[in-house]
Structure formats: structure tokens, C-alpha cells
Amino acid sequence: MSEEEQTNGSLSIRKPSRMPKCSRCRNHGFVSPLKGHKRFCNWRDCQCQKCRLIAERQRVMAAQVALRRQQAQEEEMGICSPINLSGSDTLVKNEAVGENVFTLSSGPPSPASSSATASPTNLGSRSMLSLSPAMSSRGHTDCTSDLMVDASYYNLYQPTPYSSYYSNLYNYQQYQMPSGNGRLSSHNVSPQYRTHSYYSSYLSQGLGAACVQPSTCPEPKAAAFSDGAQDSVSISSMINAENKLECESSSESGSFSVDSIIEGATK
């Protein structure tokens, strides 16, 4: 017992307390404790090969620490949870998985080939076949991911199953042009509220001069806009000529009567 106690005491004496040392100073042959030394290091801006390797290693370690911290925060928020994947699963790619699926589903393998083909690729393909439904449900395309997305978080990016029902919710019907009788095909209007049919005939025949009438001739205008205004252009021109003659005669007779009345009053 005494010898064991002595050996334990000697080991405790030999093993000093671990204090980190400056790696840049060690590269140049100096030993200096790291605590409070980073600001005053003489080789903090050294660009030698060893110091560049040390700087690269420090950047990689800092990135790993930041990634672990981010994963821990996501786990606390419930966004994702880590899963354990084997090495063969992480090495198999999706293209190889698709080829192995077709080869396995094409036909039953022969006994010789089944006994001879026990390769890690086939093992990886089998494991990936077992994982393929879960990965297809999550929508992942890369099997090297070590995070499994939560269902509530992933549903934000899934299309809604009622898209076909709600897609036409606010799609109104297009405006329908009026038919020959001036009504829409989906409306049944009483005869007293029906519009006249001269709009379609007027627009199709181009009777632009029929609506330009003097204010002293209301009868030709009513005749031009009646329901029987679907005549030819020659008839409308004849009506316009007659209207002009009647208007001129009425204006002349009106002026003569006015002049005669004025002359009689002066006499």
C-alpha cells in the first residue's frame, strides 16, 4: 500500500497544472503563457508557414464553435433536432441510390452475385433505401445533412392541400359582350328595361353621320334611332337629304312669318 501511495504521489508531483502557451512564440523558440499575451505577442502578425497554419486552424475552430452554438440555439427553439447517421449513409450520394434502386427492383439477383456482392456501396444503398421515405417526406436532396427539420417548421414551405379549392376564390368571370338583343346571356330583363338594338347595328355599319343632327329636327333623329335602323347606308343618306330640305324650308317659313309680324307692327 505504501508503494502505491508513493507512486500516486510521484505522479501528482510530476504532472504540472496545464497552462496554455502561445503557439506563435513556440514556433520561434519562446515559451510564454497565453493568458494576457495575445495583445503583446511579438509574432502576432508573422506570415511564416507555421504561423499561417496556426491562423488557419484558429479560423476553422472558431467556425466550428459558432456552428455548434447555432445548432444549440436551434434545438432550444425547437426548430430542428439532431439525428445520428452512420458513416456509410453519409458517403452514399443520391445518384448512386437511384441506380441501385433500379438494379434491385429490376429482378431477383442470382445466388452467385448475391454472395459475391457484399460491398459497402450496396450496404449504403440498402440503408439509404430504408431512409428514402423519411427523406422524401422532409424534402431533402442531400443525404449528408445531420439535422432533421421539425414538422411544424417544414409545413411553412409545403403547398396547401386546398390550393385547388382556394385558387378560384376571387377569380371573377370575365365581362361578356352584349348579344344581338342588347342583353347579357346570364340576365333576364323585363321588356320595359331592355336596351335598344341600334347599338350593335350602329357600331357595325359605321353610321357616324346619323347621330349628328341639328337641334331643330327631332323627328329625323327619332327615326334614325328607331328599332328599324338596320337599313343600308343609301337609305340613311336619303333620309339625311330630306331632313336638310325640311329644315331649310321650316327656317325660311319661320323667318318670313317673323318679318311679316314685325312689318305689321310697324305699320
From Swiss-Prot:
Return one Gene Ontology term, BP aspect: germ cell development
Q: Where is this region: Disordered?
A: 102-137, 246-267
List the subcellular locations.
Answer: Nucleus
Can the keyword Zinc be found in this entry's annotation?
yes
Q: Which GO terms describe its molecular function?
A: DNA-binding transcription factor activity, RNA polymerase II-specific; metal ion binding; RNA polymerase II cis-regulatory region sequence-specific DNA binding
Keywords from the UniProt entry: Activator, Developmental protein, Differentiation, DNA-binding, Metal-binding, Nucleus, Repressor, Sexual differentiation, Transcription, Transcription regulation, Zinc
Q: Name where it mostly resides.
A: nucleus
Q: Where is the composition biased (Polar residues)?
A: 122-135
Name the tissues where it is expressed.
Expressed in developing germ cells of both testis and ovary.
Q: Does the keyword DNA-binding apply?
A: yes
Q: Which residues bind DNA?
A: 22-69
> One Pfam family, short name please?
Dmrt1
Among SMART domains, the record links this protein to: DM
Q: Name one GO cellular component term.
A: nucleus
Bias regions of kind Low complexity — which residues? Answer: 112-121, 248-260
What does this protein do, in the record's words?
Answer: Transcription factor that plays a key role in sex determination and differentiation by controlling gonad development and germ cell proliferation. Acts both as a transcription repressor and activator.
Q: What PANTHER family does the record point to?
A: DOUBLESEX AND MAB-3 RELATED TRANSCRIPTION FACTOR DMRT, DOUBLESEX- AND MAB-3-RELATED TRANSCRIPTION FACTOR 1
Family designation: Belongs to the DMRT family.
Write the protein's name.
Doublesex- and mab-3-related transcription factor 1
Native organism: Danio rerio (Zebrafish)
Q: Which gene encodes it?
A: dmrt1
